[in-house]
């Protein structure tokens, strides 16, 4: 009898969760074991009714009561312990780690310690604790497969996904759309509104990640992820602005060859690739019509995109704690911008100041990661008043 692959989706109501569930609807190979959500209980209830998971996880008791009033045939768990449980139970085959922010750290580590196949969309697990997470993955024989379109592209371009080929890599080149303001100079962005920043030209994404794309913080975080995922030094990572988002990333090998992964901008492709790996599954995505595109590229200037400069400097100095500061400060500053408490350009300006002023030792465990994160947020709050 055919046995379906059981999947836990952390962050089921977000954009990655949506695309993951879209893949599941189109195929008959997966069984939803657990769904989690932070605030959108109504949507979670609808998903529970459709996919009938064994578990659902919400952050607190009031949301548990609300969910239980809407659905009755699912076991509802609460908080971090619930997230860690559904990420590590023996029945689970795959964990989609798609919670936004540092809240995704503990359940991702729980999945790694349980030796799971982890589909990683949560950037912060690598950004804030890459050295610790990779150790857990290796120690427990877990699998870590990137879901971000750029890293999944690199994953597909590396020969047999085998780290033995890493000495043959001359450069990993991450492509970036450049966001909605790629053709504007900094002085033109003084009065950018949250609505404008969230209007991404190529991808449908959540508000926070849309702002991150517009500032290129998203790409800066992806540089950190690539550093850990592919065990390469910072000088072997490059960024190119590619407005069409057709080439999702590429690898230059030492013999001068380039291997790139192409496709229309649709998150179902990298998600399906990760879900089915090492095989490929058939999903309904638009074919790439090469006659409709002219592919263009330009340099990602560090002076224009200050987030890249901050992160490359941190990696070159092996200052991993500074990346935690950068990430935490960004989350606070983006939230302040979306709530119209600061101006758009202050997101990077204040982050640059905070990253320079706060100095911590590189964390030795996950508790120290959270401590650096907490102290950074408190400091940013004090700066913003």
Curated annotation (Swiss-Prot):
Q: Which reaction does it catalyse?
A: 2-C-methyl-D-erythritol 4-phosphate + NADP(+) = 1-deoxy-D-xylulose 5-phosphate + NADPH + H(+)
Quick one: which residues bind 1-deoxy-D-xylulose 5-phosphate? 123, 149-150, 177, 200, 213, 218-219, 222
Which cofactors does this protein require? Answer: Mg(2+); Mn(2+)
InterPro entries linked:
DXP_reductoisomerase (IPR003821), DXP_reductoisomerase_C (IPR013644), DXP_reductoisomerase_N (IPR013512), DXPR_C (IPR026877), DXPR_C_sf (IPR036169), NAD(P)-bd_dom_sf (IPR036291)
What does the record give under GO molecular function?
A: 1-deoxy-D-xylulose-5-phosphate reductoisomerase activity; manganese ion binding; NADPH binding
Binding site residues for Mn(2+) = 148, 150, 222
Q: Which UniProt keywords apply?
A: Isoprene biosynthesis, Manganese, Metal-binding, NADP, Oxidoreductase
Name the enzyme's class.
oxidoreductase
E.C. numbers: 1.1.1.267
**Pathway of action:** Isoprenoid biosynthesis; isopentenyl diphosphate biosynthesis via DXP pathway; isopentenyl diphosphate from 1-deoxy-D-xylulose 5-phosphate: step 1/6
Superkingdom, taxonomy of origin: Bacteria
The entry sums up its family as follows: Belongs to the DXR family.
Question: In UniProt terms, what function does this protein have?
Answer: Catalyzes the NADPH-dependent rearrangement and reduction of 1-deoxy-D-xylulose-5-phosphate (DXP) to 2-C-methyl-D-erythritol 4-phosphate (MEP).
Q: Can you name this protein?
A: 1-deoxy-D-xylulose 5-phosphate reductoisomerase
Its source organism is Francisella tularensis subsp. novicida (strain U112)
The primary gene name is: dxr
């Amino acid at each position: 009898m055919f046995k379906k692959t059981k999947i836990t989706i952390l962050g089921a109501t977000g954009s990655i969760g949506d695309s993951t569930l879209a893949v599941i609807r189109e195929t008959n190979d997966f069984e939803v074991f657990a769904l989690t959500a932070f605030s959108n209980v109504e949507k979670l209830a609808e998903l529970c009714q459709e996919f009938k998971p064994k578990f659902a996880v919400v952050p607190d008791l009031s949301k548990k009561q609300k969910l239980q009033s809407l659905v009755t045939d699912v076991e509802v768990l609460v908080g971090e312990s619930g997230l860690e449980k559904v990420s590590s139970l023996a029945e689970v085959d795959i964990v989609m780690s798609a919670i936004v922010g540092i809240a995704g750290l503990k359940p991702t580590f729980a999945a790694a310690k349980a030796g799971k196949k982890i589909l990683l969309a949560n950037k912060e697990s690598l950004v804030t604790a890459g050295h610790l997470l990779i150790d857990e993955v290796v120690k427990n024989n877990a699998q870590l497969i990137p879901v971000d379109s750029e890293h999944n592209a690199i994953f597909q371009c590396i020969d047999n996904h085998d780290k033995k080929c890493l000495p043959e890599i001359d450069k990993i080149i991450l492509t970036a759309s450049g966001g909605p303001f790629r053709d504007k100079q900094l002085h033109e962005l003084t009065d950018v509104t949250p609505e404008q920043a969230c209007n991404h030209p190529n991808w449908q994404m959540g508000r926070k990640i849309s702002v991150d794309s517009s500032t290129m913080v998203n790409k800066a975080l992806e540089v950190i992820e690539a550093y850990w995922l592919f065990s390469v030094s910072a000088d072997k990572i490059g960024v190119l602005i590619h407005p069409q988002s057709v080439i999702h990333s590429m690898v230059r090998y030492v013999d001068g060859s380039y291997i790139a992964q192409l496709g229309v901008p649709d998150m179902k492709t990298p998600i399906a690739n990760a879900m089915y790996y090492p095989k490929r599954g058939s999903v309904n995505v638009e074919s790439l019509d090469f006659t409709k595109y002219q592919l263009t590229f330009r340099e990602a200037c560090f002076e224009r995109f200050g987030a890249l400069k901050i992160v490359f400097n941190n990696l070159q100095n092996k200052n991993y704690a500074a990346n935690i500061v950068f990430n935490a400060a960004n989350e606070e500053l983006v939230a302040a911008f979306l709530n119209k408490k600061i101006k758009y350009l202050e997101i990077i300006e204040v982050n640059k100041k905070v990253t320079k002023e706060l100095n911590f030792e590189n964390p030795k465990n996950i508790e120290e990661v959270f401590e650096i994160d907490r102290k950074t947020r408190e400091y940013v709050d004090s700066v913003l008043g």
